[in-house]
Amino acid sequence: MANYFNTLNLRQQLAQLGKCRFMGRDEFADGASYLQGKKVVIVGCGAQGLNQGLNMRDSGLDISYALRKEAIAEKRASWRKATENGFKVGTYEELIPQADLVVNLTPDKQHSDVVRSVQPLMKDGAALGYSHGFNIVEVGEQIRKDITVVMVAPKCPGTEVREEYKRGFGVPTLIAVHPENDPKGEGMAIAKAWAAATGGHRAGVLESSFVAEVKSDLMGEQTILCGMLQAGSLLCFDKLVAEGTDPAYAEKLIQFGWETITEALKQGGITLMMDRLSNPAKLRAYALSEQLKEIMAPLFQKHMDDIISGEFSSGMMADWANDDKKLLTWREETGKTAFETAPQYEGKIGEQEYFDKGVLMIAMVKAGVELAFETMVDSGIIEESAYYESLHELPLIANTIARKRLYEMNVVISDTAEYGNYLFSYACVPLLKEFMTTLQTGDLGKAIAEGAVDNAQLRDVNEAIRSHAIEQVGKKLRGYMTDMKRIAVAG
């Protein structure tokens, strides 16, 4: 199989990379009705599989789970989760032939085996669904021409998909139809009904493409969402300890600092995050972020280039074939780092203290978010997609670090994201070593002293922060989500 994206000509590549349309609420007036009365079979019962299934069932759809024979016989976690939640469970052979929509929610590395197993069992004219397009775009999986291929990709972990639905809302979602597999022209109707059944239409849906979703998703998770947080955690911890900070305090400042900082990001973008700082600290964070962007830009561009060309995917798939040797080695090495093994701090750190003593961390967040966004947009990805794959998801990933440090982040994210995270962080840490030696008192671990501020400089910095393209599109999208939530709750 050949990488699908690389089989397209340049015009087709640009068209698919740039496909992104914010869909109106009125386009979902029929809700999930297109799939009602039809049989939906989900393959896989992990976080996305279970929680999407729960939402879809609560939306009135007929949901069952197809699992491998051995998973059922051995009563593995997937079988237990499905049965304990009252779902019908059966083998591929028992359930797939009757399915109108088969939703493949297994890990990326299992997709080819799963598709090879289920495709011969699928009835003529059925539909195959994904929540990530890696198998179609990067692996180049060939699907029977009578099968409709669609994607519904919630921009949150599975647990969040469920919790937001229970609140009467949903999570922002990308939907797409594979242009090579829409024989009856019903792909968009299926995708819209599926998205509505998960609650995504209440938070905002982008009509995208398999290509745009995959390329932007890989870029976001490798750089700002995971790679930058891992590299920043290791660098900041080592710097604090080297400067004489208690390792336990240093660990807590970083572990919970990312979550506290990005909560402001979630509520009001980079503007609000920077506004949490004193004026002298804001000016310093801005200056540091500009330095970081200059240093890291080539690394971000290399990751984007390798994602676009398929170099990243081919390297990762080679590691799959080698029993994940690189992935498992990097995972083990991360677990042995000083940050991961540091003692816990029992004292309290106030919310504002995380901002006041984390100026460098704020600069890293700002630089990483803007670089990821800019690099994606420069590569042909539309701003809305770039926003969701950079700034929007960052607080969710930061929350995993707050739970159990980097270990938890790497457990929760996909193996694909974890592999890309290590590639980035292993390159970023040495890249920033010299920069870390130039830090001043007040950049990390201590608050910046109050001092005189040049009004013109502060005015210009505030304007530069607020006028960045990600702040403009972010304000629009966050406003839309707020309005949608208000309507949903009122309803």
UniProtKB/Swiss-Prot annotation:
Q: One Pfam family name from the record?
A: KARI_C
Q: How is the cofactor bound?
A: Binds 2 magnesium ions per subunit.
InterPro entries under this entry?
6-PGluconate_DH-like_C_sf (IPR008927), 6PGD_dom2 (IPR013328), KARI (IPR013023), KARI_C (IPR000506), KARI_N (IPR013116), NAD(P)-bd_dom_sf (IPR036291)
Keywords, comma-separated and alphabetical: Amino-acid biosynthesis, Branched-chain amino acid biosynthesis, Magnesium, Metal-binding, NADP, Oxidoreductase, Repeat
Q: Which residues bind Mg(2+) 2?
A: D217, E389, E393
Which cellular components does GO assign to this protein? cytosol
- Output the superkingdom of the source species: Bacteria
Query: In the UniProt record, does the keyword Magnesium occur?
Result: yes
Positions contributing to NADP(+) binding: C45, G46, A47, Q48, R68, R76, S78, D108, K109, Q110, G158
Active site (UniProt)? H132
Function description: Involved in the biosynthesis of branched-chain amino acids (BCAA). Catalyzes an alkyl-migration followed by a ketol-acid reduction of (S)-2-acetolactate (S2AL) to yield (R)-2,3-dihydroxy-isovalerate. In the isomerase reaction, S2AL is rearranged via a Mg-dependent methyl migration to produce 3-hydroxy-3-methyl-2-ketobutyrate (HMKB). In the reductase reaction, this 2-ketoacid undergoes a metal-dependent reduction by NADPH to yield (R)-2,3-dihydroxy-isovalerate.
Q: What is this protein called?
A: Ketol-acid reductoisomerase (NADP(+))
Organism, by scientific name, is Klebsiella pneumoniae (strain 342)
Gene encoding this polypeptide?
ilvC
